[in-house]
Design a protein with these regions (language model features):
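Charged, compositionally biased N-terminal leader segments and the immediate start
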Residues: 1-10
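Secondary-structure capping and boundary motifs in well-ordered enzyme cores
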Residues: 5, 19-22, 58, 94-97, ...
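Glycine/small-residue-rich interface belts in oligomeric ring/scaffold proteins
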Residues: 12-75
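C-terminal auxiliary extensions adjacent to catalytic cores
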Residues: 39, 43-44, 155-234
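Alpha-helical transmembrane segments of multi-pass membrane proteins, especially transporters
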Residues: 52, 124, 154-159
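Internal, conserved structured core segments that host functional sites
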Residues: 63, 68, 75-146
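Amphipathic alpha-helical hairpins/coiled-coils and adjacent low-complexity
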Residues: 136, 147-155, 162
């Protein structure tokens, strides 16, 4: 018999694997705008951008969203969070990308790990009553897998870091070994995202500061819509 905790970890590894067909390979979440402006050209410049992205946007959006899902006491709260988390993503490409990847993640998760909330979420998306934002979808799936809140936050942030780094490897381009060096360095930033989001949650202000990202990054993400030539959808 497999240890239940091991089942949860294995499920987490499946659903956060970069090979999962969610379409993450087609999103830069704004770094292509900086790349087009010749501000991202090597390991040092991409690492600086990625650290800023984790510290100033991902921590205050997806990390907090996962924690708010864990704090929910009924599914009606999940419906509210799905609206809130989707609405706070101001750049259109980022908002639509979050929904597209979230719906694919939910579809896979509903077939592989069909818990009550997961199936209700899928029904809500199918009936176009819910958006299926990736962060709230992941929070619901992680709760169903019975992994700890900190682990769920870390897994989602780290999976995003890996996807973006893999995209930078082929987009900038960077070497494969360089990409691995960036991912190793990013583990510290993931730890900060976990700690900061935990503190904000414990202080009871997670919902209040949700979406409090860096305006410059959001503007760059918006400008991406009007770039002449694009490798990525966001």
């Amino acid at each position: 018999m497999t240890d239940p905790s091991l089942n949860g970890i294995l499920g987490l590894m499946q659903l956060t694997d970069s090979a999962l067909p969610t379409g993450a390979f087609s999103h830069s979440l704004g770094f292509e705008t900086y790349m087009h402006a010749e501000q991202l050209e090597d390991q040092e410049s991409f690492s600086a951008w990625l650290e800023m992205f984790v510290d100033q946007q991902l921590t205050y959006t997806d990390a907090l969203a996962v924690r708010l899902v864990y704090a929910a006491t009924d599914f009606e709260r999940i419906e509210d969070l799905d609206d809130l988390v989707t609405a706070q993503a101001l750049p259109r490409q980022v908002r639509e990308g979050g929904m597209t990847m979230g719906k694919r993640l939910l579809s896979i998760g509903a077939r592989s790990y069909p818990g009550d909330w997961v199936l209700r979420y899928q029904q809500g998306v199918d009936e176009e009553r819910m958006h299926g934002h990736q962060a709230t979808v992941w929070g619901v799936l992680a709760r169903g897998l019975d992994v700890s809140e900190d682990t769920a936050v870390a897994a989602h942030v780290y999976a995003t870091v890996i996807s973006l780094t893999q995209n930078a490897v082929r987009g900038i381009p960077l070497g494969q070994n360089t990409g691995q060096a960036v991912i190793r360095a990013a583990q510290e930033w993931v730890g900060r995202a976990v700690a900061t989001s935990r503190r904000l949650s414990e202080e009871g202000i997670a919902e209040e500061v949700l979406g409090a990202g860096a305006p410059g990054l959001e503007i760059a993400q918006m400008n991406h819509e009007r770039q002449r030539a694009r490798l990525f959808m966001s």
